[in-house]
């Protein structure tokens, strides 16, 4: 009888423990605390403005909190995210093309685009080839004709050396038959390149549609061609590389990442919450005002897209590293 009572007591205790465990799981259902979003640039930049716009509209059980960790062109913040706990409470807002360039340029041996979990992409930005009003050129063909007739006269700005922006530009320059006829000038970011173009220190630049939106509106920047497969909504009258017979179409999505091994539950929760924001007409209006284009891409599709770009861009980064 005592033995039977002991068995019953053991079962009751075990059941109580399981029940307590289940209750704890319910209490700690994700997210049970604020989710930090690392923005790897200073406040006021494109990634910062975009994330704060998402924070304005997102509906989560816990708040999404912005944490700016800038430096080294966004790499310091990216590495901070890489080394963070994979518990779903720290994510990264970043441009996948920058994430790719850190590895392809040799800044790190870690393949961050695959060593971070892709949550989703939310908007597209586009590299655009532009000139200034001082040049007098209205079309790509006019610029190319001048460059061929005046070797060495054109300085062409890019937003950084060993970047996707520069790799795209090298490929476009080659496709236009201008290799050796123009001088590429790398700057530290889009704002610096844009300023140089306005001051006529350079005559052409490759820069983001979001970075040039205000100067295009004022007439100081003349967009000649978008490096994309479709025309950006912000620049509907600007032809694309494909329209010009150039097979270079690397868009610039902006998206969100989590440390490797973050649970699928957390990834799905965040992706679904962000997807709802991207479908919000007010959010769409906000990002279009920034020169961006709302376009939700889930994590798997986003990762696959970037993997294809990596394969395409690797030989060009090798060329850049060799100084060719």
Report residues per predicted region.
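N-terminal (or domain-start) structured segment
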Residues: 21-114, 153, 177-206, 296, ...
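An extracytoplasmic/periplasmic, membrane-proximal ligand-sensing/linker region
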Residues: 32-34, 180, 265-324
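Hinge/capping helix and adjacent helix->loop/strand transition within the periplasmic-binding protein
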Residues: 58, 80-90, 103-192, 241-246, ...
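A ligand-binding cleft/hinge motif common to bilobed small-molecule-binding domains
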Residues: 96-107, 170-176, 203-237
């Amino acid at each position: 009888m005592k033995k039977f009572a002991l068995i019953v007591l053991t079962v009751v205790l075990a059941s109580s423990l399981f029940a307590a465990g289940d209750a704890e799981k319910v209490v700690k259902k994700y997210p049970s605390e604020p989710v930090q979003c690392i923005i790897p640039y200073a406040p006021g930049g494109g990634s910062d403005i975009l994330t704060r716009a998402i924070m304005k509209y997102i509906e989560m059980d816990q708040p999404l909190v912005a944490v700016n960790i800038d430096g080294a062109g966004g790499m310091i913040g990216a590495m901070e995210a890489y080394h963070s706990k994979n518990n779903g409470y720290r994510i990264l807002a970043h441009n996948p093309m920058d994430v790719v360039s850190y590895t392809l340029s040799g800044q790190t041996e870690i393949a961050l685009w695959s060593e971070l979990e892709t949550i989703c992409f939310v908007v597209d930005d586009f590299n655009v080839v532009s000139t200034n009003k001082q040049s007098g050129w209205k079309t790509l063909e006019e610029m190319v004709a001048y460059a061929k007739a005046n070797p060495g006269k054109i300085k062409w700005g890019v937003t950084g050396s060993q970047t996707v922006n520069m790799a795209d530009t090298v490929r476009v320059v080659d496709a236009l038959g201008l290799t050796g006829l123009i001088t590429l000038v790398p700057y530290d970011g889009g704002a610096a390149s844009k300023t140089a173009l306005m001051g006529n220190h350079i005559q052409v630049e490759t820069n983001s549609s979001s970075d040039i939106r205000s100067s295009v509106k004022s007439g100081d920047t003349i967009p000649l061609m978008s490096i994309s497969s479709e025309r950006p909504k912000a620049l509907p009258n600007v032809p694309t590389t494909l329209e010009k017979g150039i097979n270079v179409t690397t868009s610039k999505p902006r998206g969100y990442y989590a440390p490797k091994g973050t649970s699928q539950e957390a990834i799905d929760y965040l992706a679904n919450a962000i997807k709802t924001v991207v479908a919000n007409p007010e959010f769409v209006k906000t990002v279009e005002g920034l020169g961006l284009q709302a376009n939700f891409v889930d994590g798997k599709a986003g990762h696959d897209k970037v993997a294809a770009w990596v394969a395409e861009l690797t030989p060009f980064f090798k060329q850049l590293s060799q100084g060719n």
